[in-house]
A protein has these predicted regions:
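Flexible cytoplasmic inter-helical loops of multi-pass small-molecule transporters
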Residues: 192-213, 401-413
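Cytoplasmic helix-loop-helix junction between adjacent transmembrane helices
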Residues: 112-151
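Extracytoplasmic gate region of multi-pass secondary transporters
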Residues: 37-39, 219-264, 268
Length: 452
């Protein structure tokens, strides 16, 4: 299975990381636009009397637009590279955001949100091959983790700036001038700083390198399914956290926006740490399964705490928001590694299409559920999605280039478990304590009296 270049030909480490940082900034600007309407929901309710379900639908418009073009951008990515795609996509997103900011009708506003989402899809697909092409396997988890902080950092900045911008403006929609400016700057940065990684030309590639990876196994399909299911908690927490804090816990817009920003910054740090963790254990997908289990537990706790109106509900919401964003970088890294350099763009486009379908459908569905039954039942339903993802994760599949490291880690875990079960230290000396003594007696076949 081809994974692209494994060394940075002609580029220093600093130059490679600069490319990752620029890719991060470009993608973060796009996500400020994609998720920006969610932070306009309080202003839309107050200024225009927009119902929560309708406001949730408006916040989904960029996602609907992304669904229409993600695979197309992925195809262009495989053909022309990241530099062109990021530049053109950022420029088009800037134009659409500026036009949406000056719309007075809801229909016109929604239409430009869809068009902007179609353009912003370019930034969502691009960047993965920059990591797989410029970084060796043992650094890709960390590099992709840094690159994938774009979404939570973009959302954090949007949560901090857009509600204040909307409150200070005559129209809530004028707040979208902020992402329009950022996307215009991003287009310039892409031209100046992005360098596409080296790879063979299409006519020089072997038949195996050009072969459809979906015909070889179900691994990519399972990763797509998992990432789509785990997108629901991420979308629900991002969309409704601000209004939930304001309506249910009487937070001011400044405080609520600050808490959303805090959760996204923590999520960004978490993505980097989880990416590094995946490099160390030699697996991208085993941590994803652990994150799925954590998501189920946290959302169940949040539903219960919110039902009781407990003060612990707010930190649980922050925790749920953090856990919900941790997995995405691992799945994107796995896609680029398994799909190879000639299919990674289309594979990421397909994965992001499934994610955006869930992201587009979740806000109006959960907005209606919240309006009719309240937040606790909505959180319970939201927790079912990571629960469904747990058995689908192909956790035993090892990334190309890290098989030896993964097997070494498995051997070390087995050796630690055997040592623990034996009741001795690794050098053979007995461990102190009643538990170790019972383990030694059990190993020798002697009866062990229950503790009193």
């Amino acid at each position: 299975m081809t994974t692209g270049s494994t060394n940075a030909v002609g580029l220093s480490a600093g130059r490679r990381w600069l490319i990752v940082v620029v890719s991060l900034l470009v993608t973060a600007s796009a996500f400020i636009f994609i998720n920006g309407v969610a932070f306009l929901i309080p202003a839309l309710e107050e200024d225009r009397g927009t119902p929560l379900a309708e406001a949730g639908l408006l916040s989904s418009m960029p996602s609907f637009g992304m669904v229409a073009t993600l695979i197309l951008w992925g195809y262009l990515l495989d053909r022309v590279g990241e530099r062109v795609v990021l530049t053109v996509g950022s420029a088009l997103t800037a134009g659409a955001a500026y036009a949406a900011a000056h719309m007075h009708s809801t229909i016109g506003f929604a239409a430009w949100l869809v068009i902007g989402g179609m353009a912003a899809a370019s930034c969502n697909s691009a960047g993965g091959r920059l990591v797989s092409g410029w970084f060796p396997p043992e650094q890709r988890g960390l590099a992709m983790g840094v690159r994938q902080t774009a979404q939570p950092l973009g959302i954090a900045l949007g949560a901090l700036v857009i509600p204040e911008f909307a409150e200070a403006s005559k129209s809530a929609m004028h707040a979208l001038i902020f992402p329009a400016i950022l996307c215009a700057v991003s287009a310039v940065l892409s031209v100046v700083a992005i360098t596409d990684p080296p790879r063979k030309e299409w006519d020089e590639a072997t038949a195996q390198e050009l072969a459809n990876p979906y015909r070889r196994s179900w691994v990519l399909r399972r990763i797509h399914a998992v990432s789509a299911l785990l997108m629901v908690p991420q979308t629900v927490t991002v969309t409704f956290m601000l209004i939930w804090l304001i309506a249910n816990y009487k937070c001011s817009i400044v405080l609520a926006g600050g808490l959303v920003t805090l959760s996204q910054v923590l999520g960004a740090v978490g993505r980097v740490l989880v990416g590094r963790w995946s490099d160390r254990v030699g697996s991208r997908l085993r941590p994803v399964r652990i994150m799925s289990v954590a998501g189920v537990l946290v959302l169940a706790g949040l539903a219960f705490a919110d039902h009781l109106r407990s003060s612990i509900a707010v930190p649980l919401m922050i925790t749920a928001s953090v856990v919900a964003v941790l997995d995405n970088g691992l799945e994107s890294t796995a896609i680029t590694e398994y799909a190879g350099p000639f299919w990674s763009g289309r594979s990421l486009g397909l994965q992001n299409t499934y994610q955006r379908l869930m992201a587009a459908g979740a806000p109006p569905v959960f907005g209606g559920l919240i309006a009719s039954h309240g937040y606790p039942p909505a959180f319970v339903v939201c927790g079912l999605f990571p629960l469904l993802a747990i058995p689908i994760v192909p956790a035993r599949t090892l990334p190309p280039g890290l098989e030896t490291r993964a097997r070494t880690q498995s051997f070390r875990r087995l050796r630690r478990w055997i040592t623990f079960r034996s009741g001795d230290w690794p050098d053979g000396t007995p461990r102190p304590g009643p538990l170790a003594r019972r383990q030694r007696l059990r190993r020798r076949g002697k009866a062990v009296a229950p503790p009193t």
